[in-house]
Amino acid sequence: MPKDRTRRRFLASDVQLVVERSSEHPVEYAIVLLVLRNGRWGTVRTFDNAHDPSEHHEHAYVGLEKQSPTVTYGPVNDAMYAAELKLLRDWRDIVHAWEHMQ
């Protein structure tokens, strides 16, 4: 299903959380933590279920390079809630770690 719903939330002037999801079932989603550096938005962390509705990936990034995911299984709503909550609670630490791996 195409992701036809997008919600953006600025966590700081240079950090945003973007949630994209499909309206129809099975729900496909991507939840992305973005950071503005040197005039460009870069991805720091991605959560998605691109391969299967019940297979959830968490991708960290080193620079621009996506790392192998941590994979979990379960209901879409639970995974989306957990991903968004993790980013809302821990975004400062996640961004700090990403900046020190550049």
Regions inferred by a protein language model and the residue ranges of each:
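Negatively charged, low-complexity tracts enriched in Asp/Glu with abundant Ser/Thr
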Residues: M1-N38, G42
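Intrinsic disorder/low-complexity segments enriched in polar/small residues
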Residues: D4-R5, L17, H56-H59, L85
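A short, structured beta-strand/loop element
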Residues: E28-S68
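Generic marker of "main functional regions" within proteins
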Residues: E20, Y29, W41, H57, ...
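A sequence-composition feature that detects small, non-aromatic residues
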Residues: A12, A30, A50, A60, ...
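Acidic, low-complexity intrinsically disordered segments
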Residues: L64-Q102
